């Protein structure tokens, strides 16, 4: 079933004038919250979800003795989720399998090529990258094609609480990629970890 067919069945019609392109970059197998975020994107009528890129959480798997190949497990989790939702028109891309080796590292993979291709597409709709894990794929794409920086906006769920800061999970999975992203010319909307927590009013 196509995503917009599902939206139509739910009574939603995507307003073309407000359409924005979205690519989701996710470590979906790491925690269950990514699945909810993915479905939220897919069921938002204004979002033209162009694809979903799987990213790794290899630092966690190494430190905690968990099964390796975290990117592949995230890829399979996204496929499972789309299958359960009967959505078959959104491509899922394999991402980088490990953190960047250096600030100049530019590994090639399906996700990196897809990010570059979509950023360079001749399309008036703005492109947003919803980053829900390590930003390795995005940083590698910026290293391979710096010209895409002005053609997309990255919404990054990562970084310690503002303004004090502290080590944070998504940063720890690839701190070099975070530095590449923040040093680039791309517009970044950062959502620190403290803004993802619900708290009672004091």
Whereabouts are the PLM-identified features?
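Active-site glycine-rich loop that binds ribose-phosphate moieties when present
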Residues: 111-112, 136-137, 155-182
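Positively charged, low-complexity intrinsically disordered leader regions
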Residues: 1-14
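Flexible, glycine/proline-enriched loop segments at strand-loop-helix junctions
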Residues: 64-68, 101-106, 125-131, 162-172
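Conserved small/polar residues in nucleotide/adenosyl-binding loops
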Residues: 196-202
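Histidine-anchored nucleotide/phosphate-binding helix
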Residues: 34-44, 139-143
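Short, glycine-rich nucleotide/cofactor-binding loops
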Residues: 24-33
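Glycine-rich nucleotide/cofactor/substrate-binding loop typically near the N-terminus or early
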Residues: 20, 43-121
């Amino acid at each position: 079933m196509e995503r917009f067919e599902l939206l139509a069945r739910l009574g939603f019609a995507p307003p073309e004038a407000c359409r924005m392109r979205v690519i989701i970059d996710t470590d979906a197998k790491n925690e269950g919250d990514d699945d909810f975020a993915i479905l939220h994107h897919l069921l938002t009528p204004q979002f033209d979800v162009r694809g979903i890129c799987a990213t790794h959480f290899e630092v966690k798997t190494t430190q905690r003795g968990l099964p390796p190949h975290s990117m592949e497990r995230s890829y399979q989790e996204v496929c499972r989720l789309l299958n359960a939702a009967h959505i078959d028109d959104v491509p899922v891309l394999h991402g980088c399998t490990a953190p960047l080796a250096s600030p100049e590292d530019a590994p090639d993979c399906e996700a990196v090529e897809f990010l570059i291709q979509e950023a360079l597409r001749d399309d008036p709709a703005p492109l947003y990258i919803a980053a829900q894990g390590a930003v390795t794929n995005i940083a590698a794409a910026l290293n391979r094609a710096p010209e895409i920086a002005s053609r997309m906006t990255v919404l990054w769920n990562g970084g310690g609480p503002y303004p004090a800061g502290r080590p944070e999970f998504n940063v720890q999975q690839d701190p070099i990629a975070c530095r590449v992203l923040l040093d680039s010319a791309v517009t970044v909307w950062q959502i620190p970890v403290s803004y993802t927590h619900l708290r009672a009013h004091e």
